[in-house]
Amino acid sequence: MALNCDDKAHIRAIWPCLASHAEQYGAEALHRMFLCHPQTKTYFPNFDFHANSAHLKNHGKKVMNALTDAVKHLDHPEASLSSLSDLHAFTLRVDPGNFALLSNNILVVVAVHHSDKLSYETHQALDKFLNVVSGLLTSKYR
């Protein structure tokens, strides 16, 4: 599912609002994922899963910063995500289905905080973008 020029424009328009709250939104998305899908906690054995914990904020910021880097490289996001793909596939061995779960929760967080900016077109573009990212992160799984 390739991103077209309109998708990229919608992503670039809303992303600064998300990047400026990377820690908060990333932590909220992870917290929602862990609550709704407790099986995803298995990859974080020493985490404090309480809302606003330092663990959630730290990892949430990493997630959102990686997405911000991918947004900066929308024409070739695979270059910015290659090392993360290696890490998740070969070292962490994260269930590839978890990326879709987290993507959904990121969209929920965007809707909660930016419903006024989340037009149908922007929602669709973000969904496509997160699917592209998920696909790239799972591309090295066998």
Curated annotation (Swiss-Prot):
The modification N-acetylalanine is found at A2. Keywords: Acetylation, Heme, Iron, Metal-binding, Oxygen transport, Transport. GO terms for molecular function: haptoglobin binding; heme binding; metal ion binding; organic acid binding; oxygen binding; oxygen carrier activity; peroxidase activity. Pfam families: Globin (PF00042). SUPFAM superfamilies: Globin-like (SSF46458). Heme b binds at H88. InterPro entries: Globin, Globin-like_sf, Globin/Proto, Hemoglobin_a-typ, Hemoglobin_oxygen_transport. One of its GO terms (cellular component) is blood microparticle. It comes from the Eukaryota. The alpha-C chain is a component of adult hemoglobin C. This is Hemoglobin subunit alpha-C.
